[in-house]
């Protein structure tokens, strides 16, 4: 029986229908909040025991488990059984969130404020959707203070230790150059004095 065991295979053209007799979630057993994560993976899936599935449905469920935000890795594996196919879902849970740090350390936003934003999430499994929501709050904090160019980015990959570093580029303007563009879109000598324009900035 063909069954996708990763997203690349799930995109293949094989459309064989397969009866799923059992679903087993693996990879959560050693995690402090393992049972919650097992249920989160199962609840994200539309496939249940007794479902007849193909690669398209498997791909949808693979994406849905990722979209829950609790996992940094998901793979499907299949084992043939007497009553159908046993679907094994191997998950890699995100770590328990322990600390958020900001880089560089001399930003105008305080560590205390960042900790306040994340306070209720410390000690719980990191959820990437919640992380993005919190990052949006930090961006809004900057926008509310006139830093419209500020950028906040999360980590490129999640480490196992639960320490997350956010990179903040406050978008501080270091220089302003004034040019006068004519109707022909070429640079011209302006009639307005440059100091008058700078005064209004």
Residue ranges of model-derived segments:
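Periplasmic polypeptide-binding modules associated with outer-membrane biogenesis and secretion
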Residues: 2-201
